[in-house]
Amino acid sequence: MIQIVTVRSGDSVYSLASKYGSTPDEIVKDNGLNPAETLVVGQALIVNTKGNNYYVQPGDSLYRISQTYNVPLASLAKVNNLSLKSILHVGQQLYVPKGTKRAVESIAYLQPSTIPIKESLVNATRAINPFLTYLAYFSFEAKRDGTLKEPTETAKIANIATQGKTIPMLVITNIENGNFSADLTSVILRDATIQNKFITNILQTAEKYGMRDIHFDFESVAPEDREAYNRFLRNVKTRLPSGYTLSTTLVPKTSSNQKGKFFEAHDYKAQGQIVDFVVIMTYDWGWQGGPPMAISPIGPVKEVLQYAKSQMPPQKIMMGQNLYGFDWKLPFKQGNPPAKAISSVAAVALARKYNVPIRYDFAAQAPHFNYFDENGVQHEVWFEDSRSVQSKFNLMKEQGIGGISYWKIGLPIPQNWRLLVENFTITKKG
């Protein structure tokens, strides 16, 4: 049985294997470790324990364990002769009966930064293909004349998806000159001739590459274009051929009257009625230009999902999950150079390099640490690990959410994919 273990001082791959009844090779493989490197105090690993034995970790509760393993809380308590209010102790051994997994859908976004695409990124895409329902190629950019600017090597990426029975998504953005453009969007939404040409080009492109989901990631849409955007989506929906789906990206909102040009044009209720599913960007509370904090703290993410559920069926909701973290220089000041984006693997490597422990914020459900670099500058790092990912999986179960959407491929959390299939059955539609 897979469980998450937090590294303590003196732990090694060999000592953990012995303690939990696993093997060093399995721990190395499941966590993407370099056997020559030491573990970091506070690092979260997944370990395959013997049988159905579970060893209580910091922050655990019976409820959390029952969620993680898809076992009714009362059943877990009863089989271990515990009350529902029993206090657990770190290291305590529990027996966890086999649970029942539910099916969800999953998306991962691919955003190449080079032409041609780096082979390492292509290989990373192939490696996670078995865990995906959809592969989202970011992005086809809308143009003012109703045509599309295609990303590089589209056919190659679409073929990788279909070979793994994954549906390639045609992701269309309103990006112009590197930024999301309200003006560009207005042209498409308000000119019927251009709009119809635009939809025709989209459908022809989707057919050409076998992309059976049409996905609009229109951001920074002018508030006055809210109803025009809804009408546009209805227009696309009526023209979709049989066997195709329509989806959109939504910014994270907690109310229908949330103010700000970033939020107002995204109509959760209308889009929930029109499209087949939505991807909600439940991340970037901690962002490159803001103060250091968790990128997707569990509390705010839950608030967004609860609001979304009040506007649409939960099975239509794909919760956004960041695969990246950020490294901020301190002290933070507005106007500082942006924080550096890093992967989970890179974050742990930094903690190892500077010999600092990784801490875990149980309120935010996110790992973090501080270090001083060679120039004496202090840094603060927030990232994702197996604990924070598992907390999001538990939230999906609690809220009955239809799936998860990862941004983006190439920023590895090695444990994520094993945990995903331990928690859920991934729907394949290809």
Q: What label would you give each PLM region?
A:
Residues S120-K143, N201-I214, K392-I404:
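Catalytic domains of carbohydrate-active enzymes, especially glycoside hydrolases
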